[in-house]
């Protein structure tokens, strides 16, 4: 069975592949491969979100790495993009994030970054997977003198906060702004509120008391209802919501409207173009990005390139084409001038700076950006359904979608989720009634085939 998915290793804790045994062997395999390539003892940094299972996985990875002669640097709860930054800042050889992002607390995962701050290549993931599954690995283990050590790094959050502040123009601040923040009881529960406070904003924080099981629970980027309520009640200028590992951000304007990644990407693109900093006047988005946004950017002289869903594909296209801005509707925004991955706190601060600089309310920044009606349905795949049958269901649904599209002024996207056992159906159409009818029809067909 395949261990690595589209975004590292992920699954329900204590169920394959998210078991202590697999994590131990993953740590051993990573360290072994690094030792073959490096002239020195491997140094590997480990960060995590706030899930209770993070302790289990952190201990297993640390044991695996140190048993193979590598040193481990433990930074505790910290956003995924902070690990990408710290890997470069601390000159270590690799970084590991223990997180299942927006998934419930019962899930967890492992993402690995190489020493340049980019996610591991598929080739290296395959090499690690082969060693995990190799019963004869490791044939030789280090002697007692060659074992690694584990160190706890106390100032990691402070380093990351100072880095984010450095992305703003010198002497700039956010004084005069009132900002509501929902870190989803996740990895940024201290960082984003502290960051905005140090920049001079008035900060109201909710869902910032993680207990190991409340991460993403009816809060954060996927459940913005409580943030909408607090923004309205406190008359905040806007609200910020992250997911569990804070690699994404969505905003809420002062009227309580959700400002997703499509809007954020558009505002950032226009601002960069105005400052002549948008490379090749191009942004990279995914197939999920709204057609209305694409048309709006086109009229503004900005080209959009689409990729498959997943920030790794956005990053790949950005590197290939030499672009510096990309993102997803879900709120993964990659500002390549500062970071190599989706970074929720950086996105939030950059947007706050634009709002203050232009002296506009967020609602005014988005009011002219058109959106075609769009709806998404997630169809759960039965646990024991073979992969071939899932592929067959998607194929038949896609054929049905092609027929339905002939009578639409829009599009249909059907794809398997890369992180959960679900089929995702997205329908976009200028006519909201037709959109609902098409979505209901496809859902009925999918449920019939999966029952």
UniProtKB/Swiss-Prot annotation:
InterPro entries: A-D-PHexomutase_a/b/a-I, A-D-PHexomutase_a/b/a-I/II/III, A-D-PHexomutase_a/b/a-II, A-D-PHexomutase_a/b/a-III, A-D-PHexomutase_C, A-D-PHexomutase_C_sf, A-D-PHexomutase_CS, Alpha-D-phosphohexomutase_SF. GO terms for cellular component: cytosol. It catalyses: alpha-D-glucosamine 1-phosphate = D-glucosamine 6-phosphate. Pfam families: PGM_PMM_I, PGM_PMM_II, PGM_PMM_III, PGM_PMM_IV. Binds 1 Mg(2+) ion per subunit. Its cofactor is Mg(2+). The keyword NADP does not apply. The active site is at 101 (phosphoserine intermediate). The keyword Phosphoprotein applies. The modification Phosphoserine is found at residue 101. It is an enzyme of class 5 (isomerase). Its EC number is 5.4.2.10. PANTHER family: PHOSPHOGLUCOMUTASE (ALPHA-D-GLUCOSE-1,6-BISPHOSPHATE-DEPENDENT), PHOSPHOHEXOSE MUTASE. HAMAP family: GlmM_B. Belongs to the phosphohexose mutase family. Catalyzes the conversion of glucosamine-6-phosphate to glucosamine-1-phosphate. This is Phosphoglucosamine mutase. It comes from Thermodesulfovibrio yellowstonii (strain ATCC 51303 / DSM 11347 / YP87). The gene is glmM.
